[in-house]
């Protein structure tokens, strides 16, 4: 598979890649709930056979650690829209230099959000799994995203509490 870069100027960490691909495969094979964030969304896409755009200018964090911001369109009817309370245009943070557009998307994954200005996919989900959602933004940086993005963590906890091996 393709290597997942950790950021501009950061060396690829193959042991980390192998560990994360193995952990994701373990979870997917058991239909465990998965929430991918940033690199996690990229990892999900590559693990399903997709690829990445290796360098996307204008999406990485500033030198002072601040996030870039942009609008993302969440598709109505998607799992992500259900978690967020509806499809809409949301203002989110951006801290990544890799990503994907529809041509790089794994065909078995659905793009459930994208950036209208440049077509960068901002969220993926797997229709073959109960709860596999991945977002390019960082919802853990709560002050930089709408409050309903915290529902991603609530949804993960809810699905994890129902998970039976």
Residues of each region from the PLM?
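Pocket-forming structural segment of enzyme catalytic cores
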Residues: 48-122
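Hydrophobic/aromatic beta-strand patches that form the interior of the parallel beta-sheet core
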Residues: 35, 112, 133-135
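Conserved G/P- and acidic residue-centered "switch" motifs that form tight phosphate/ATP-binding loops
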Residues: 38
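Acyltransferase
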Residues: 135-165
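Beta-strand-turn-beta hairpins that frame and shape the catalytic cleft
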Residues: 127-132
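Catalytic nucleophile loop
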Residues: 41
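Flexible gly/pro-rich beta->alpha loop and the following alpha-helix that scaffold active-site loops
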Residues: 1-35, 48-49, 53, 154-157, ...
């Amino acid at each position: 598979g393709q290597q997942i870069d950790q950021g501009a100027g950061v060396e690829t960490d193959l042991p980390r890649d192998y560990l994360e691909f193995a952990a994701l495969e373990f979870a997917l094979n058991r239909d465990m709930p998965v929430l991918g964030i940033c690199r996690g969304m990229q990892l999900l896409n590559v693990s399903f056979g997709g690829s990445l755009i290796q360098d996307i200018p204008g999406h990485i964090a500033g030198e002072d650690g601040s996030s870039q911001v942009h609008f993302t369109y969440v598709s109505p009817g998607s799992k992500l829209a259900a978690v967020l309370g509806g499809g809409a245009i949301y203002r989110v943070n951006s801290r990544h230099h890799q990503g994907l557009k529809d041509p790089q998307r794994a065909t078995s994954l659905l793009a459930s959000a994208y950036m209208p200005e440049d077509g960068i996919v901002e969220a993926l989900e797997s229709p073959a799994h109960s709860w596999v959602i991945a977002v390019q933004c960082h919802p853990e940086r709560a002050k930089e995203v709408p409050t309903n993005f915290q529902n991603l963590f609530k949804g993960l906890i809810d699905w994890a509490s129902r998970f039976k091996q």
